[in-house]
Amino acid sequence: MSLEDSLRSLSLDYLNLLINGQAFSDVTFSVEGRLVHAHRCILAARSLFFRKFFCGGSDPSASSGLIDQTGVRVNPSGSPRSSNGVLVIPVNSVGYEVFLLLLQFLYSGQVSIVPQKHEARPNCGERGCWHTHCSSAVDLALDTLAAARYFGVEQLALLTQKQLASMVEKASIEDVMKVLLASRKQDMQQLWTTCSHLVAKSGLPPEVLAKHLPIEIVAKIEELRLKSSIARRSMMPHHHHHHHPHDLNAAADLEDQKIRRMRRALDSSDVELVKLMVMGEGLNLDEALALHYAVENCSREVAKALLELGAADVNYPAGPAGKTPLHIAAEMVSPDMVAVLLDHHADPNVRTVDNVTPLDILRTLTSDFLFKGAIPGLTHIEPNKLRLCLELVQSAALVLSREEGNANNNPPSSTTTTLPMYHHPMNDDHNSSSSSGNNHNIGNLNLDSRLVYLNLGATVGSGQMSDDHGGRHGDPAMYHHSHHDY
């Protein structure tokens, strides 16, 4: 047996004492109404905080005591005792799960800060989540970090910081901002640097950041963006290196002003002004995340008009997660936005950094409805809209797959014509014969989509999925080419 194995074995011996509960226990903590049995000698040996606490001294400043959320100090000599005479000490400063993690580390020097995979967590609505970088995992790590700092267990604090630094690389921007705030509050410079750069790269404008972060942090993020912009310009092979720094500052401010003007124009449905900015001022719609903004904040008509300018990439990935406008429309459960994006050749199979497609998002939301019903966080979603979104994206993926298969089997000739392949079923103006032809080519919904269709309890009404001229119900899997504008 190696030295490392021997040390690990000794650590597990201590951990077994904690797991076995009352065996040789001489102190009991009450956390969230649950009793945790422990051993004063081990806690005092591993933690200066507990050593001072158990010593108890007459001077409150000399003995930290256990402090609850109201700031009341608990004196061990005055604490109640259990039936067998063991001290029962109330702990209100941390939760039960975090307190157990803290004790596990004190007993063994080892701990896993990631929640159990696939278990239901309060801040994670995704079934089957591995909890590696979701909101629940980030919250647990932040709580553990706060507890480690509170109880003075610096080794655990360092371990948790490394864990968080790994998590934020794949976490949502909202969670990154939470970690950013914690790193500033607890003066963790390395974690601050990592998170601030991720927020700076997110593309979120200052007015959005200001809703989540203090104004001084927003100012630092903008300063980082400015430095990054200057660095990029200095690497460009042109002759403008002699420009004064304040000229570069002015250029960066000008870009920010352009983006703000563009968003105001989109908010007021003035796409013509956006067009003038593209043609006359060189506005880059992709870098300004114009389409992402329009999908999330504007009407379908504005998004459609923006796409028809031909200056925006419908599949442009944004932020650390690499979400496209179609990902955002899927998360919003907006059939209108999904339809207009697919009509302009949005890729239904495009993946984020985490390999998530728009179809994955809709399937996850659908399974949540089927297995959980309306749950907190999903109450704003209408089942009919969710069904339509799922059908649109599934059928678009099916058409794309078949076209790719046909292209591989039959190399295109010089006379081949490419047509738009997606069409919103609610706006179909073709006659019955056209629909029948397309139905023969595309086929029916697959079994998965039919199950979703039935389970959500939605029926296709004549006002939703019918042919306007022929008067018959349209196949929900049909996405015809339309010769008219929406």
UniProtKB/Swiss-Prot annotation:
Compositional bias ranges of the Low complexity kind: 406-418, 432-442
SMART domains per the UniProt record, alphabetical: ANK, BTB
Coiled-coil region list: none
Cellular component GO terms held in the UniProt record: cytoplasm; nucleus; plasma membrane
Binding site for Zn(2+): C124, C129, H131, C134
Segments of skewed composition (Basic and acidic residues): 466-475
Disordered, as annotated region: 403-442, 464-486
Pfam families: Ank_2 (PF12796), BTB (PF00651), DUF3420 (PF11900)
Tissues showing expression: Expressed in xylem vessels and parenchyma cells of pedicel vascular tissue in the abscission zone (AZ). Accumulates in developing root nodules and present in roots, especially in the upper part.
UniProt similarity note: Belongs to the plant 'ANKYRIN-BTB/POZ' family. 'NOOT-BOP-COCH-like' (NBCL) subfamily.
Entry text on domains: The BTB/POZ domain mediates the interaction with some component of ubiquitin ligase complexes.
Name of the protein: BTB/POZ domain and ankyrin repeat-containing protein BOP
Annotated source species: Lupinus luteus (European yellow lupine)
Lineage: Eukaryota, Viridiplantae, Streptophyta, Embryophyta, Tracheophyta
